[in-house]
Amino acid sequence: MLRYAFRRIAGVIPTLLVIITASFFIVRLAPGGPFDQEQTLSPQVRANLDAAYGLDRPIAIQYCRYLRALAHGDFGPSFKQRDFSVTDLIAQGLPVSSALGITAIALAILIGIPLGIAAAVWKQTPLDVGITSLVVLGIALPGFVTGPLLALVFGVYLQWLPVAGWEDGAARYFVLPVVTLALPVIAYVARLTRSSLLDVFRANFIRTARARGVGRWRILWGHALRPALLPVVSYIGPATAFVVTGSLVVETVFGLPGTGRYLVQGAINRDYTLVMGMVIVYGTLVLLLNLLADLVYGWLDPRVRHE
């Protein structure tokens, strides 16, 4: 198991370096610059700003300088929000985004797995049909559709929850964004659990257990559930990536001060360092959670770690 873990951990650093390098050159080579929207600037003032931020240097030198600063934990200053460094903005937004993402994933697991189990145990019944219909609907509707719909129903018509904004410690501001972000993941986890559990029910060792008179629920909890959850565990990594990308839309729709909203603002304003900082944060989170999913999968399935 340790060798398997070291092998997985060793792949994280070069992957992160590729993400940093690709993001740096894509951002810098994109049309426009951080000061192009400021029409009142004279050419001399703009040249002075470029020199102050090192944007007048060749892109290869800018890249080397950025890596050197990054090695010391310095993400650089924000070009647009000049009173803040990128580290300050990450420190402000990361707790909000982390709480949003972790809660959405936890909600998806706590709801999606029981729904999938119920649909598999009572397959081809009205319960199965109802769950399957909701699953298809949840997968089909993207966050930028479900978010405004939920805000319209529960925020405007019923006035149960706020439709936007953020107050520290106020859970009611978190309900609609978390549900919006979690719904597609709940649907996919439920579908994956149902199909995987039905496959396990058709396996030879389950048939043997039934022939020996083992009860239905003992077969489910004692024999079938653990192997059926292996595909669900492997999906946690892609689900994390989905939640990360989905948070960009959700935080913008509901006005949450998270890293996703800062990333969107940075991309619009061509704030190079802010975009890079947020991309690195998101890339690191996705890689670490994928690593965690791989380790859990290897612990559950010995065949994987011995390959």
How would you label these PLM feature ranges?
Residues L16-R65, K80, F84, L158-F174:
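Hydrophobic alpha-helical transmembrane segments of membrane transport/permease proteins
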Residues I19, S23-V27, G147, A151, ...:
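Juxtamembrane/transmembrane-helix interface segments of polytopic membrane transporters
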Residues I26, A30, E38-S42, L70-A71, ...:
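Hydrophobic aliphatic residues
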